[in-house]
């Protein structure tokens, strides 16, 4: 398995290095000024520690060495401009402060219009003005006419009307013949571009099939209408013109006996591995893919997001941008992204839905409202084999889309760039790591450390804590409207396609994989309750309480890992590697999900005695909730394995990709856990239902939300139900306690899930003869009136007066 990881990264590193040497060159700055940008234009900053502009730095380099061509000195670079106090240009700052964004061939491969890139190459080699005219024509003309116009301009400059007529004849040829004739006329530059990009685009945009290859280089064909399953993991993946769906391996194990845990300083001995000896089963499940070819003729594929601006982060005020990028090399993530790649990535996330229940799924870039039935909303449980009410599911999905996705998309799109999103994730990661250390136990750190419910955050030993993470009080979130938007909407940043693409593969696929399943589970959750009938069935309440406990434990394990990874990044060079062995070794994560013995114990204690296949068949909500939890556990574990493997191979770009991907997924996990608690609290307080949770899990949840407050803004019970009622009123949906009439009783069958969930071990470290005691949720919530319920001080005072 590790050889598969190694081969995949080796091939990627070789591909990037080979592509960088012969990447197409453009007139710097002109390419993005001449196009119609999809988002707001880049900002000009006044901070001398930020980036320098394209033309100013290029001119300064040309003045220093007039004998050399600027395009040879800076192949494929895009730069930004900074001034002192907004007036004086800064061209003498250090090389690290004037950070350069490299646009490698990997980004060039993501552009759809191949012939335009080839014309750019030839235009730069022959005449600088010809390239600028061709790029200007590309932004204004239709996609089908862009190649013809560019060739016409080139023909007028070189060979006149004769070559122009030949280009027009080539433009009307069929499919591959048109590109081959154009290659013969334009020369070797365009032929090289076609060799690099043409095959990936042709394979990916095939209407009838999508080709991929497995670890043994065996190609297999995926039909969009059929689901496939194979036991081979994708180990070496091509990077096509768009973000291609990577198959995520789920690490399932047979029952084993766990008898203890191990600290980091003890090392990995044979007895420790013997306790976790098991047979792993890895598989891939590929569902039907949407064919994105129709997007090619609806959107201008030449458009790109503007060049991104990276800033210093407030969490490290004494660190310059150059020093920050040396530690966290995220500049490759800030490259402009093609609009078509964004749209296709948005479609990939939507493909998780069932065609029977969701013919049209919500998307980030949706411009139309989802179809639903206005009027009364009936939320009773439908008994049967995956039976659900199509009316209720459509209404619940519309409410979810209105409250979370569409609101977040309107607040972020065209206002916040994915470069700002990367900066927010990095700043929040450092802040939550400091809070984890401040609130943690500061002892018993290491692999397999059982973070029990009352003390969920492990923290770090004092000798392993960097100076920048040693705080004497809780670190608060950064201020500003942009930060407030990115912290809200139940962790909606994972739905942002630009940000998922920016963190690069395989993190893009991991986040998409987990987010898609959690999204589908939330659609069904929103279809089961409203303010007049917030109750679930007893089975649903019991199972949702168990999943809430598991999500809190999983989120705490992810926060502990992020804290240790951040400390390793910021630690002084003299720190021993053994202090951070928990994030540098990948082997433990192959045996224990998230390397958390507590999580494995709780899975057995809460779900071990449940007949999961029968429950999932009778309750579609529980079925998708189980699938969502399994997907999140798999994705989080894969992030940790990827980080450790990249550390061994010294691949810093993939390390930081896995690091930020885990931070992004943690925000979505916190949002889903918040939503589960609000629904359970509504059933307990508003519906009068008895719900029991393990004692201490609500304390762990409150501590987790307090530590992760720079990353996620917790939503209270009162604000959630008020926002939900407002959304229903806006959509014209009325809550009712009536039973669904038979004439409107349209029952459909949701797609059955694959019962692939496995327990790590049927034996637990926690003594089975002493089960975890439970408490009533309604009584336990009274301890957190302000934090969870959202009651103001006047309401609390009135409650105390009535009580005493």
Swiss-Prot record:
PTM remark: Phosphorylated by US3. This phosphorylation is required for proper nuclear localization.
Location of the region described as Disordered in the Swiss-Prot/TrEMBL record: 1-42, 58-206
Sequence repeats: 117-132, 133-148, 149-164, 170-180, 181-191, 192-203
A GO term, aspect molecular function: RNA binding
Alphabetical keyword list: Host cytoplasm, Host nucleus, Late protein, Repeat, RNA-binding, Transcription, Transcription regulation, Virion, Virion tegument
Region (6 X 16 AA approximate tandem repeats): 117-203
Primary localization class, coarse: virion
Family: Belongs to the alphaherpesvirinae HHV-1 UL47 family.
Function, in words: Tegument protein that can bind to various RNA transcripts. Plays a role in the attenuation of selective viral and cellular mRNA degradation by modulating the activity of host shutoff RNase ORF17/VHS. Also plays a role in the primary envelopment of virions in the perinuclear space, probably by interacting with two nuclear egress proteins ORF24 and ORF27.
Subunit and partners: Interacts with US3 kinase. Interacts with ORF24 and ORF27; these interactions seem important for efficient virion nuclear egress. Interacts with ORF17/VHS.
Protein name stated in the entry: Tegument protein UL47 homolog
Organism: Varicella-zoster virus (strain Oka vaccine) (HHV-3)
């Amino acid at each position: 398995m590790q050889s598969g990881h190694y081969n995949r990264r080796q091939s990627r590193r070789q591909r990037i290095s080979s592509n960088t040497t012969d990447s197409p060159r453009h007139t710097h700055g002109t390419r993005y000024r001449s196009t119609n940008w999809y988002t707001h234009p880049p900002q000009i900053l006044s901070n001398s520690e930020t980036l320098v502009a394209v033309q100013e730095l290029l001119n300064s380099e040309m003045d220093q060495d007039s004998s050399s061509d600027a395009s040879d000195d800076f192949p494929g670079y895009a730069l930004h401009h900074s001034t002192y106090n907004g007036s004086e240009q800064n061209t003498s700052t250090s090389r690290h402060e004037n950070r350069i964004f490299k646009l490698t061939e990997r980004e060039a491969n993501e552009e759809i219009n191949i012939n335009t890139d080839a014309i750019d190459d030839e235009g730069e080699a022959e005449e600088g003005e010809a390239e600028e005219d061709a790029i200007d024509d590309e932004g204004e003309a239709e996609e089908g006419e862009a190649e013809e116009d560019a060739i016409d301009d080139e023909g007028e400059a070189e060979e006149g009307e004769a070559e122009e007529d030949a280009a027009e004849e080539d433009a009307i040829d069929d499919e591959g013949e048109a590109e081959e004739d154009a290659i013969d006329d334009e020369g070797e530059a365009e032929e090289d571009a076609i060799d690099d990009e043409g095959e990936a685009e042709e394979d990916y945009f095939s209407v009838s099939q999508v080709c991929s290859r497995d670890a043994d280089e065996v190609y297999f064909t995926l039909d969009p209408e059929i689901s496939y399953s194979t036991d081979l993991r994708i180990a070496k993946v091509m990077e096509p013109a768009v973000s291609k769906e990577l198959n995520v391996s789920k690490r399932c194990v047979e029952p084993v006996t766990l008898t203890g845990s191990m600290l980091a300083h003890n090392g990995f001995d044979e007895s420790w591995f013997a306790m976790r000896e098991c047979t792993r089963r890895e598989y891939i499940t590929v569902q039907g893919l949407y064919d994105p070819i129709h997007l090619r003729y609806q959107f201008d594929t030449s458009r790109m997001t503007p060049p991104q601006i990276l800033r210093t982060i407030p969490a490290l005020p004494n660190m310059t941008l150059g020093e920050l990028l040396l530690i966290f090399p995220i500049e490759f993530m800030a490259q402009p992204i093609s609009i078509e790649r964004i749209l296709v990535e948005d479609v990939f996330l939507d493909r998780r839905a069932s065609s029977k229940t969701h013919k049209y799924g919500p998307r980030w870039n949706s411009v139309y409202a989802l179809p639903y039935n206005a009027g009364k909303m009936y939320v009773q449980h439908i008994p049967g084999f995956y039976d659900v009410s199509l009316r209720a599911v459509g209404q619940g999905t519309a409410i979810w889309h209105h409250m979370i996705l569409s609101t977040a998309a309107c607040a972020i799109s065209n206002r916040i760039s994915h470069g700002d999103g990367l900066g927010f994730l990095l700043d929040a990661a450092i802040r939550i790591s400091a809070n984890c250390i401040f609130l943690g136990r500061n002892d018993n750190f290491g692999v397999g450390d059982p973070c029990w419910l009352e003390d969920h955050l492990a923290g770090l030993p004092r000798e392993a804590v960097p100076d920048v993470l040693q705080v004497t009080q809780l670190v608060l979130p950064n201020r500003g409207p942009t930060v407030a938007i990115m912290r809200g909407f139940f962790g909606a940043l994972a739905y942002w396609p630009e940000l998922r693409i920016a963190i690069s593969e395989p993190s893009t696929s991991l986040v998409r994989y987990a987010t898609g399943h959690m999204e589908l589970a939330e659609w069904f959750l929103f279809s089961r309750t409203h303010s007049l009938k917030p109750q679930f069935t007893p089975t649903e309440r019991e199972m949702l309480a168990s999943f809430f406990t598991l999500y809190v434990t999983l989120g705490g394990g992810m926060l502990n890992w992020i804290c240790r990874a951040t400390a390793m990044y910021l630690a002084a060079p003299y720190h021993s590697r053994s202090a951070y062995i928990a994030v540098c070794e990948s082997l433990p994560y192959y045996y224990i999900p998230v390397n958390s013995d507590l999580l494995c114990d709780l899975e057995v204690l809460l779900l071990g005695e449940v007949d999961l296949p029968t429950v999932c068949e009778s309750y579609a909500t529980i079925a998708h909730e189980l699938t969502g939890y399994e997907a999140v556990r798999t994705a989080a574990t894969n992030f940790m394995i990827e980080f450790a493997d990249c550390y061994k191979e010294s691949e810093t770009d993939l390390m930081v990709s896995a690091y930020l991907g885990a931070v992004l997924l943690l925000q979505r996990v916190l949002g889903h856990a918040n939503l589960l608690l609000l629904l359970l609290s509504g059933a307990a307080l508003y519906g009068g239902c008895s719900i029991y949770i393990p004692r201490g899990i609500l304390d762990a949840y409150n501590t987790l939300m307090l530590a992760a407050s720079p990353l996620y803004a917790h939503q209270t019970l009162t604000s959630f139900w008020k926002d939900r009622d407002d959304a229903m009123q806006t959509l014209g949906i009325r809550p009712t306690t009536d039973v669904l009439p038979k004439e409107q009783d349209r029952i459909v069958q949701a797609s059955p899930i694959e019962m692939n969930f496995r327990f790590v071990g049927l034996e637990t470290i926690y003594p089975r003869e002493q089960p975890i005691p439970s408490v009533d949720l309604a009584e336990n919530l009274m301890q957190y009136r302000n934090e969870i319920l959202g009651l103001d001080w006047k309401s609390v005072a009135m409650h105390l007066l009535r009580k005493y």
